[in-house]
Regions:
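Formylglycine-dependent sulfatase
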Residues: 1-352, 360-399, 403-413
Length: 413
């Protein structure tokens, strides 16, 4: 990272493979986890809105690997529903509440889980709450606010720099947790026989990242290490999504990946047998319950990203961001650049098209340029094809519906 040093995550990447085109499908907490643990795209598992539940018949990681003889534990943040569909063993030591100001943790629980029964293989999810807001962990004093390099979609204010330093401090704390976990594996002589995958959750909780379908929200950090299988120092630009993790684990455990799972095993990518994986990455967004409905769908082929804002006549509002101190400092700025950034965030056209190689921060919309009309048409067609396959009816699917009794009462009046 330009601003922050992540020595433990960097070391993990050097030991194995770095994914340059890894994506989540929904850039918010609960549905991201649902996708990881079920291997299904958001509309397929049903829990595509934040704080929502997956469909009753959906199975998940602990069930699949449990049936293959593994014990499956989860330490840290849960944020999945309903719990009956996710029968993880609860491993203590890491905070579960993502908005808690307390970021203290200990590793005793994960140590005991790892060494409990040497005859039984294990799968452990260490789900850190860092770097989720309110950014109270780590040491922010190490960052010189004036020297921080802000992303171009940020409005540069003193308050922004202060909160960005706090965010980076929590990234540093997350990196330390990765180092702690790797040290335990080493001390327990488990490192040589363990597949370790690190992924980020979603983009940072600044405007234009989390809760959006721009790259800053859906593009993810992902590295994997597996001695004897993954060669050190590998990199890949293969398009992968979080739905690929569960089928990978099933494959590694010797199981057969069921047809209901949307993702594909990454083992061939790990072994360098292929340089490609998916042709496209897909993303959905539904703002409810974080604000008024604002449905978005998007697709990327690795070079271009198409974003389809299904209700462009609406103004985008995300309730957590609206109250943030740094965001209030943005609104107070009266410059052309500040107005441009705020308008990009709040008022969006129906279609956005970006060359993510030349314009990684997606500041130059190509959707209305004749030169890119063929690419726009191709990606629009492929996105609509995927939506149909996923039984995604678009804007109507995302608008909240009143409970049946309230609907009946309104009709009688």
């Amino acid at each position: 990272a330009v601003n922050n040093k992540t020595p433990h995550i960097d070391a993990l990447a050097r030991q194995g493979i770095k994914f340059n085109s890894a994506y989540n499908s929904v850039s918010m907490s609960t549905p991201t986890r649902h996708c990881v643990y079920t291997g299904m795209y958001p509309m397929h598992h049903g829990g595509y809105a934040n704080h929502s539940s997956v469909n009753a018949d959906v199975k998940s990681l602990p069930t699949y690997l449990g049936n293959l003889g593994y014990r499956v534990g989860l330490a840290g943040k849960w944020h999945i529903k309903p719990l009956a569909n996710f029968p993880f063993e609860d491993v203590p030591g890491f905070p579960k509440g993502c908005t808690s100001p307390n970021t203290d943790y200990h590793t005793k629980g994960i140590e005991k889980f790892m060494e409990r029964d040497a005859s039984q293989p294990f799968c452990l999810v260490l789900a850190s709450i860092n770097s989720h807001a309110p950014w109270t962990g780590g040491d922010a004093s190490v960052f010189d606010r004036k020297k921080l390099q802000l992303p171009p979609q940020f409005i540069d204010t003193e308050v922004t720099r202060e909160y960005y330093a706090r965010y980076l401090a929590e990234v540093g704390l997350l990196d330390q947790q990765v180092g702690d976990a790797m040290q335990i594996l080493k001390e327990k002589n488990l490192l040589q026989n363990t597949l370790v995958i690190f992924i980020s959750e979603q983009g940072t909780q600044f405007a234009g990242a989390k809760w959006t379908n721009w790259s800053a929200g859906v593009k993810s950090a992902m590295v994997a290490s597996w001695p004897g299988v993954i060669k050190p120092g590998m990199e890949t630009s293969a398009i992968v999504q979080y739905e690929d993790l569960l089928p990978t684990f099933i494959d590694v455990a010797g199981g057969k990946v069921p047809d209901v799972i949307d993702g594909k095993s990454l083992v061939d990518v790990f072994q360098g047998k292929t340089k490609t994986h998916h042709k496209y990455a897909y993303h959905v967004h539904n703002n409810v319950p974080e604000g008024p409905a604002y449905p978005i769908r998007s697709i990327s082929d690795g070079r271009y990203r198409l974003i389809w804002n299904l209700t462009p006549e609406e103004t985008y509002v995300e309730k957590h961001i609206e109250k943030a101190e740094w965001y209030l400092s943005w609104k107070a700025q009266d410059t052309d650049q500040a107005h441009k950034i705020m308008n990009r965030y709040k008022n969006r056209p129906e279609f956005e098209l970006y060359d993510i190689k030349k314009d990684p921060f997606e500041m130059n919309n190509l959707a209305d340029m004749k030169k890119y009309s063929k690419k726009k048409a191709e990606l629009t067609m492929e996105l609509q094809k995927w939506m149909k396959q996923q039984n995604d009816t678009g804007a109507d699917k995302d608008r909240p519906r009143a409970p049946k009794n309230k609907q009946k009462k309104a009709a009688n009046v």
